[in-house]
Amino acid sequence: VAITAAAGAGRYAEVTHEKEELVRKAAAMTGGDVQRGEAAFSRYGCGGCHAVKGVPQASGTVGPPLDGVAVRAIIGGRLENKPANLQRWIVDPQSVSPGTAMPRLGVTPADARDISAFLYTRT
């Protein structure tokens, strides 16, 4: 039992380290803050249209699920997946894809950086 507990504790530490590293990378890549991004994601009501595993208020089905954004090739159906493009899409989706169902919600550039940091951590 002690060996199993020690192995479990070791795996927990490994997973925690991996998550911390993912958060650091997302913040460095986007210039945003993951925790503020999760709060902004909720505040702007993004979860009303989009699902994100592990985020209780994000269970929408109108828009695509937002897990795995970091590994997608394209953002908004048109742009290369780069932080600046994701942020542009979040701030003004109509400028990227006129007629898209995603509305312009008044997201500030600072909030878009934070939301993009949050999304890049969702696997």
Which residues make up each language-model segment?
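Periplasmic/extracellular electron-transfer cofactor-ligation site
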Residues: 30-32, 38-65, 72-80, 88-100, ...
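Short strand-loop junctions, especially beta-strand C-caps/beta-turns
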Residues: 69-72, 105
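Generic hydrophobic-segment detector
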Residues: 3, 26-27, 50
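Electrostatic cytochrome c docking/interface patches
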Residues: 14-42
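Stable alpha-helical elements in mature extracytoplasmic
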Residues: 33, 82, 86, 111-115
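A broad, low-specificity signal for short, low-complexity segments enriched in glycine/proline
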Residues: 8-11, 24-29, 63-65
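C-terminal capping alpha-helices of c-type cytochrome domains
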Residues: 1-16, 95-123
